[in-house]
């Protein structure tokens, strides 16, 4: 299945000059959604994954079903102030300013084999923040998996030492 055909592209959203990749169309079509998760599972089945980490919000959409299919736990990474227990945090840079992500301090145990799952790799800034938190807790990142990669933004280069996978690539 060509997943690129299943992704709706919206020009000028959320602002002029942006070509937004809308993954809700994959979620709506049961065959495409199943194919996406099954493809990721096939890539990861021999990695002995303990935990899948998904960044807010679209990382939840692919990370949770992936964790279930792998028989692994799922850890959500949220924006600051959204998690109820003791957290660790990491700041990351945006085009104009910065933001902060958090995860529960007890969500990753030392030595656990971790996969990060998200919808899109652009510059890699968000994922670097997630990596920082996982590694500070002693987790071993065995793979980072994306549905979409915007290759021109060179996020993969920022994540160079990790095993990176993307199912669909766009040159922007």
Swiss-Prot record:
A Pfam entry, by short name: Pribosyltran
Domain of life: Bacteria
GO cellular component labels: cytoplasm
Record keyword Kinase present: no
EC class: transferase
Task performed by this protein: Catalyzes a salvage reaction resulting in the formation of AMP, that is energically less costly than de novo synthesis.
Quaternary state and interactors: Homodimer.
Protein name per UniProt: Adenine phosphoribosyltransferase
Species whose genome carries this gene: Clostridium tetani (strain Massachusetts / E88)
